[in-house]
Amino acid sequence: MSGADRPDRIARRIHVKGKVQGVWFRAWTVEQAAELGLDGWVRNRADGSVEAVAAGPADRVEEMIARCRRGSPASRVDSIDVEDTPGVVAQGFTQKPTV
């Protein structure tokens, strides 16, 4: 387990709205997180948005947020909300079921 409360790590919840479902956004997010060495998860939401939690070194999490703002090649990001996520985030980065 990876604690976001460690001084060298942060965790952020990222909520992305726009054309982000049916355009490989989740798979792309998993690829980006793996490239950056982040822990967390991503899932579709019933309202058509995508939600993710990313945890790791601050500079890498901030880079993930920047990449989510740009979006995957086929997506269109209209807005993004980011907030701190306290607690423990499991190791690895996975896709979760839609909620």
UniProtKB/Swiss-Prot annotation:
InterPro entries membership: Acylphosphatase, Acylphosphatase-like_dom, Acylphosphatase-like_dom_sf, Acylphosphatase_CS
Q: What family classification does the UniProt entry report for this protein?
A: Belongs to the acylphosphatase family.
Top EC class, one word: hydrolase
Q: Which Gene3D superfamilies match?
A: 3.30.70.100
Q: Which domain of life is it from?
A: Bacteria
| Positions annotated as active site in the UniProt record | R26, N44
Q: What's its catalytic activity?
A: an acyl phosphate + H2O = a carboxylate + phosphate + H(+)
Pfam families in alphabetical order: Acylphosphatase (PF00708)
The alphabetical list of record keywords is: Hydrolase
Query: Could you state a single Gene Ontology molecular function term?
Result: acylphosphatase activity
Record-listed E.C. numbers: 3.6.1.7
Q: For the Acylphosphatase-like domain, which residue ranges apply?
A: 11-97
Full protein name = Acylphosphatase
Signal peptide (residue range): none
